Amino acid sequence: IKQPTEKKGLQMKRIRRAYSKTVSLIDETAVQIYQSFVGKKKGFLLESYDKNNGRYVFMGKNPEEVIKSKENGLVIEKEDGTTKELSGNPVDLLKGYYSDFEIRKDDEQLAFTGGLVGGLGYDFVRYKEELPDNNPDEIGISTISLMLVTEFLSIDHFAETMTAVVVEDDTEAGRKKAMFRCEEMVKEAFANIRKDEKSEFQPDGKIIKQSDTLEEYSEKVNKIKQYIIDGHVFQTVLSQRWTIETKQKGFDLYKELREINPSPYMYYFNFEEFEIIGSSPEMIVKQQGKREYTCLLYTSDAAD
């Protein structure tokens, strides 16, 4: 059976569909399900750990592709281990590579139907604007680190349900394959639930490197104060980079973070060679259909 396509200019548009299966939850948590379903594999967790302000949790493993920036280009790693390198502006390459990719859905309740998840580093802005780039690369992590997700689990806090979603060919054969995989995913999610597990977290962090001394940091604070007085800025987030040595596992650190600083926007990405852990009180931008939402702090036309 041929993959369904539609003509789009001179390109052939690849059409896929999101198939799903929903089951009820009793008292299973997102962390318990993640540990059972994803475990130590390459994967992600986007969690709302504030049920009053967030509804959904998404998690997945074994991405179809991993996309990373490399100098002036992209490296695309397939699930089978093969790689493809593209040269040019990474933002333009991303748009071009996935412009012919469309996911359709039958269930309008699906808040997420698959696609790219991951992180964009601060230097991502340099792909869109001409800015000085004199800072050394201290950590060696790609500015763009994304996963193409075509199978994942979604937890709905309000409905107290879990949905397995698989993106497959928009054909009868694709539907059968996807629904079989959905059944497997539900079993995997509950197979190794550990409800009485105790936290193994033991604070052992040792700071071995700081980006600023107290004097250097204080000098930057005073400089920002002057910028505000002069009217150049009205707010600045001043950060520091600390390198901390620890024996803790990445996901254990994430679990500790969600207890210390729970929020509607928590995230954990395991790219195997590195992990990203974070918690935010608010979103920056969201597009749903033809509507675009921004928080007041970041409201700007610059994204255009």
Language-model segments: what does each one mean?
Residues 1-11:
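N-terminal amphipathic/basic-hydrophobic helices that include classical n-h-c signal peptides
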Residues 12-300:
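Extended alpha-helical targeting/anchoring segments
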